[in-house]
Every structure is written in C-alpha cells, then in structure tokens.
C-alpha cells in the first residue's frame, strides 16, 4: 500500500513537471536535429569532414621548423622537403602554421578553383605601414579597392596601348638605366635627366641615387622622393601642359584616391616596370650568351620573320621560339621565388587535404617550376620544351609557369612584361652576337631579395651583326 502511494506521488510530481519538461525536451531535440542537419549539409557541401590533414614537416616544440629554415633562400628548403612530404605540406614558424604548395596543379587549384576561399593577403605590420595599409595593388586583398586599383593600372599604364668589341659590357647597368627611364615616362610622363630637389630631405638627388632609393635598394626616403616627383609633374599638369602618363590619368579619373594611395600606385608602376622586367631579361640574355646554338636558333627565326626590319611588338606573334625563350626564362628564373602569402578566410581543401580557416599559404614558385613530375630535366634551360608540348606553347597563356600568378589575382602587368622583355631580347639578339667572357659560364646563382637578380650582374662580350647600331 505504501509503495502504491509513493508511486502515485512520483507520478503526480512528474505530471506537474510535464508542462515544463516537454518544451525543454522538444527544444533540445530540435537543437540536436538542427546541429545534425547543419553538420550534414556542411559536410555534403564542402566535403571536408573525411579529408585528411595536410602532411606535417616534423619540428621542435614551441619553435617548430624555424631552425630548419636557416638557409637564406627558404624556397630551396621548401623544394627539398617536397621530395619527402609531397607537393603540399605544413610547417610551423613559432606559433604560426604555414601550408606550402610545391606543385603547379595544387597552386592553380588555390589560385583559381579555391580563389573565393583563399584570396586575402597576410601582410606583416611593417609591410602594412610601408604600403599605406595595403594600398600596393600586388599586395592588397581581393576587395573593391584592389579591383579599382587594378582597373586603373590595366586601363592606363599596363594596357596594350601603353608604351670596345672585346670588352665585356655590364648589361644590367646599361639595361636598368633604360628601363628606369621607360618606367618614369609611363608613370610620370617625364624621364629624369639630371637631378631632383627633394624638399622633405632638404637635398638634391641624382638620377642614380633616385633609382637606388626607389628600385634597387628601397630606402626610407622613397616616400619623400615620390612626393617630390609627383609634385613636379602635378605642377606641369596644372599649368596646362599635356602630360600623357599614369599620374595624369589617376588625377583625372581616380577621384576617390587619397594622396598617399596615388603615391604608392605610381611607385608600384615604376618599381615593377624597372625591376621585374630587368630580372627576366638579364637571365634570358645570360642563358643565350652561354649557349651559342640556342642563340643562333633565335637569331635565324628573327631574321626569317623580320628580314632587315627592326623587330617590333607587331612581330612577336610570329616568333614562337622567342616566346619560348621568354617563358623558359620565367620558369627557371622566376622574378619571385615565393609569392606573397595567402590567407584562407574560410575552411577549404587543397590537393585532397583539409585546409582550416586561418591557415596561411605559401606558393613556392621555385619548387613548382622545378617539379620533375611536371617538367623534364627542370634544372636545364630548354626553350624548346614550350614548343614540343602543345599545352605549353600557347603564347597567350602567361600563367603556365606561375610567374604571373593565376586566376583573379594574376599579375596585372603580364602583357606589358611580355611585350617589353620579348621586344628587348629580340632587338638585342638581332643587333649583336652575345657571348660570355672567359670564366663567366658557370656563374648561375641568384640573390635572395624581393626579386631573384643574378648574384653578379651579367657581363657579356658583344659583336655587332649588322652595319647599323642598336641606337640608330
């Protein structure tokens, strides 16, 4: 009897709780159901649930792989690791995890297929300050500002309408001087003939000093120099003088840009035209001077197409071997060995591996272009590889070697670089026979700066091929 009473009391208490328990239970079940459905949809949509993590290069506690990156050229260490850990792996640099891509296929997947998930740049505080909070087009995130800046550069400065016999010649010094003049004319509308007074520094700088500050060894005073150059050209424009330049275009069309943004836009145009094109041209001329047979093939092609006419941009589409020389030089001697770091702002996948949001991604261009699965004898300079493979010989494909990136973040200046470099190489070979001085054949190293310049500038012996000179 007592047991029955106790049971009834328990049931009465439970009935009293029913109005409260049922909603709570239903709510919990609903939340559980929604969580399950959300997870199921996410897994089906993204396909990441069962993906393995990226292979990890073993390191030490706390510092990770920092001690293994003692070499001044980390891209070579990245390439060695790829032989052991595969085309995609991760390393730790202190508290940060970095995924390194060493395969063209995986790199293009990141740049093109997964662009929407991996389109941001990850810049240090120092670089953000240097670039006026990511105002540099090449370094900015893929946002409205980047698209606007890229549009201005492509429309004006980078478009198709832009503009002793036995003594070794210092090619780099000679060519850098001419390229710097070209970049100044494009960006500002006028070359620097003598010197410029820089008000903020309180001194007058020569053309060579300005080149060093802006291009070859970027120093703290670059902003002051750019301000003086822009002020001088702005005064010319204000006086009514017609100046057809990138600066003139920005002042007229880009009304939303700040003074600082205009400054860095113009500086970027000068830097890229005067530096990266120099790197590719110098390496190409080194390889041609080293191999007389390949140089002879290029000269014969130019002679057959151009005859006695000087090579121009209009001839380039008829010169497949010259295009092959250009692309092979980019492959073996990419102006940048590692691209600016990317940042995965949402979960994604690469190469069949799970990439969580927040991961930093490094594209090892050097490693991609040394991948033996992609390139036969990658250590050799062989322009003919771009003629034998139909997929690689398309002269309109600037992204086969990843030197210009790929996808929506591809280099805006790829067409300009091709026109300048190919025309320059063609004219130099058309006018002169090139050879290296005795002992110059084996020097084949590069520096570890922003761009991969030759460790020692190219010195070559030039022999005129024709009666007229290069400057005629």
Regions found by a protein language model. Name each.
Residues 66-86, 221-232, 253, 309-352, ...:
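Conserved cytochrome P450 K-helix E-x-x-R motif and the immediately C-terminal K′/meander segment
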Residues 276-295, 299-301, 414-431:
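Cytochrome P450 catalytic-core helices
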Residues 47-162, 175-176, 180-182, 198-210, ...:
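Cytochrome P450 substrate-recognition site 1
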Residues 6, 121-130, 145, 163-281, ...:
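Cytochrome P450 heme-thiolate monooxygenase catalytic core
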Residues 2-32, 92-99, 161-185, 193-200, ...:
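Cytochrome P450
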Residues 363-392:
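Conserved cytochrome P450 K-helix/beta-meander segment immediately N-terminal to the heme-binding cysteine loop
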Residues 2-28, 54, 303-308, 400, ...:
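Cytochrome P450 proximal C-terminal region
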Residues 34-54:
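Transmembrane-cytosolic junction motif
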